[in-house]
């Protein structure tokens, strides 16, 4: 093996170890257990303990079948990292506004399986978030476009006239 090849192998190995070390820094269990990995940031992070949050996440594209909706994972991450940083969960008002094809990700098991012939990978996360007080609001216009009615959504999911209306009222 040439000297260049040996050097490249060593550099690749060091890079791989660095990536693994960075990934292992992510906390896997937080306020929303099993979802929303985050990293603890040491030191002063400008996080006043009396802070109150009102945050809306917006998702308009469904997750690929078999995967979890990334915007919903981001909502879980937001909760996990802020609760871990000392913010009381009752000071975090979180809403996920859903439009477009993403409505399927909050569909009932029967609806989702009928559409995709498999279980909804986002359902456990949606249930966990609703259980912790996160609101899910579906755009009524998108629901109508995709042929969904209120009975097609998981328990706890609300419907608004439109996604724009939901955002305007938040």
Question: How should each PLM-predicted stretch be described?
Answer:
Residues 57-68, 94, 113-115, 156:
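Second-shell loop/turn segments in exported
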Residues 68-87:
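Histidine-anchored nucleotide/phosphate-binding helix
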Residues 17-21:
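Sec/Tat signal peptide C-region and signal peptidase I cleavage site
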Residues 48-64, 106-110:
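Acidic/histidine-rich, surface-exposed loop or edge segments in extracytoplasmic proteins
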Residues 88-106:
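Acidic helix-start/capping segments at beta-turn-to-alpha-helix junctions
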Residues 54-58, 94-98, 135-138:
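Structural recognition of the beta-strand scaffold that forms the well-ordered cores
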Residues 3-10:
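Sec-dependent signal peptide recognition
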Residues 22-34, 112-113, 118-170:
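A cross-taxonomic marker for long C-terminal extensions/tails that follow the last structured domain
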């Amino acid at each position: 093996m040439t000297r260049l090849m040996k050097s490249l192998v060593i550099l690749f190995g060091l890079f791989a170890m660095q990536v693994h070390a960075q990934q292992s820094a992510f906390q896997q269990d937080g306020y929303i257990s099993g979802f929303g990995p985050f990293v603890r940031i040491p030191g002063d992070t400008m996080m006043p303990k009396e802070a109150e949050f009102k945050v809306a996440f917006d998702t308009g594209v469904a997750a690929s079948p078999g995967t979890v909706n990334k915007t919903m994972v981001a909502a879980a991450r937001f909760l996990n990292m802020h609760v871990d940083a000392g913010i009381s969960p009752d000071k975090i008002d979180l809403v996920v506004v859903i439009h477009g094809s993403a409505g399927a990700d909050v569909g009932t098991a029967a609806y989702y399986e009928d559409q995709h012939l498999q279980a909804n990978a986002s359902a456990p996360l949606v249930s966990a978030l609703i259980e912790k007080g996160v609101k899910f609001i579906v755009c009524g216009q998108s629901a109508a476009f995709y042929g969904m009615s209120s009975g097609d959504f998981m328990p706890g999911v609300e419907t608004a006239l439109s996604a724009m209306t939901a955002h305007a009222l938040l």
